[in-house]
Amino acid sequence: MSREITARPNKNVPIVVGVCVVAFFVLLAFMQQKHKTHSGGDYGVPTFSNGGKYRDGTRSADFNSNNHRAYGCGGSGGSVSSRVGQQLVVLAIVSVLIVSLLQRLRSPPEHICNGACG
């Protein structure tokens, strides 16, 4: 009568996947490129991300404003807390999908009795 020992399912895979997903969203949150706030270009004066005026004793510049919702100025949903909330919701959805997928893929270990099981 031969006996086979089945391998235990690897319980570290969901933990590793979860840590990778969290690290990815943290990377996205902190690595967003910022717009340029100062320039040494033609004017040699600070530039403004959404328009504005600059005036000192020798120079003045008027930068045209872009869209009123640009860079979260005056638009809803542009604050940091709302972006973090949205990222947490997406993180939760992705985590649930990954966990459910891993549970579906994990099959119960096969028990081979070779006719000796009672």
UniProtKB/Swiss-Prot annotation:
Lumenal side: 33-81
Name of the protein described by the UniProt record: Movement protein TGB2
Assembly with partners or alone: Interacts with movement protein TGB3.
Organism lineage string: Viruses, Riboviria, Orthornavirae, Kitrinoviricota, Alsuviricetes
Job description of the protein: Participates in the transport of viral RNA to the plasmodesmata. Is probably targeted to plasmodesmata by TGBp3, along with viral RNAs-TGBp1 (RNP complex). Can gate plasmodesmata and increase their size exclusion limit.
UniProt family annotation: Belongs to the virgaviridae/benyvirus TGB2 movement protein family.
Residues spanning the membrane: 12-32, 82-102
InterPro entries to which the protein is assigned, alphabetical: Plant_vir_prot
Keyword Transmembrane helix included in the entry's annotation: yes
Organism: Beet necrotic yellow vein virus (isolate Japan/S) (BNYVV)
Topology feature Cytoplasmic, residues: 1-11, 103-118
Membrane topology: Multi-pass membrane protein
Compartment(s) of residence: Host cell junction, Host plasmodesma; Host endoplasmic reticulum membrane
GO cellular component, one term: membrane
Disulfide bonds: none
